[in-house]
């Protein structure tokens, strides 16, 4: 398991070897670990918002002896698994224009600026897959943070216009019904609105 300390130590260790400034946007469980919503994550997931970030990080990983499984997946010398997502795509979700701008600053090193996606976009990227671990993570976000379900649905709907998600309506319906059944948040009115939505 990868804790917040392990995440930050890795970035602190590799930062001196970079020759230019780069942005890393933590996503998924990595972001939730950095935000202290989860204790740990199985691997590290980062978005590289600019082409120069992508080039610099992949070149650095190669120089430092990281094992390249494919263009997206790398393994560090101490066996940490790192997944990289380029530009505005994460999994099958294309982030809307203000997503990177609205990301949260976590740490600034000499070369690396580390941020996390905002909570709404973290939920949206997890809704795209909606595996059991994603459901657990989303419920944890709702329990620990103030999330406006209406704002979430509006942003989700905008994101789905430009994304390639198989069952967008069914996924958010399942989530909102679960949140309602667990008395975590009231979503009945939104569920009726979702029923009328044609993505």
Regions found by a protein language model. Give the residues of each.
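Compositionally biased terminal segments of proteins
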Residues: 1-199
């Amino acid at each position: 398991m990868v804790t917040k300390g392990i995440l930050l130590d890795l970035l602190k260790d590799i930062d001196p070897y970079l020759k230019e400034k780069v942005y890393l946007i933590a996503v998924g469980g990595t972001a939730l670990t950095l935000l202290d919503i989860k204790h740990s994550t199985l691997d590290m997931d980062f978005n590289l918002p600019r082409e120069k970030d992508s080039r610099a990080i992949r070149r650095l990983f190669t120089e430092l002896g990281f094992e390249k499984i494919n263009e997206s997946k790398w393994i560090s010398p101490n066996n940490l698994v790192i997944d990289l997502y380029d530009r505005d795509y994460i999994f099958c979700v294309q982030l809307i224009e203000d997503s990177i701008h609205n990301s949260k600053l976590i740490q600034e090193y000499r070369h690396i600026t580390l941020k996390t996606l905002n909570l709404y976009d973290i939920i949206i990227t997890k809704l795209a897959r909606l595996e059991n671990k994603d459901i657990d993570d989303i419920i944890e976000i709702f329990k620990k943070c103030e999330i406006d379900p209406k704002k979430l649905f509006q942003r989700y709907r905008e994101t789905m216009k430009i994304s390639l998600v198989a069952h967008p309506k069914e996924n958010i319906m399942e989530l909102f019904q679960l949140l309602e059944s667990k008395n975590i948040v009231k979503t009945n009115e939104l569920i009726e609105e979702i029923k009328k939505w044609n993505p």
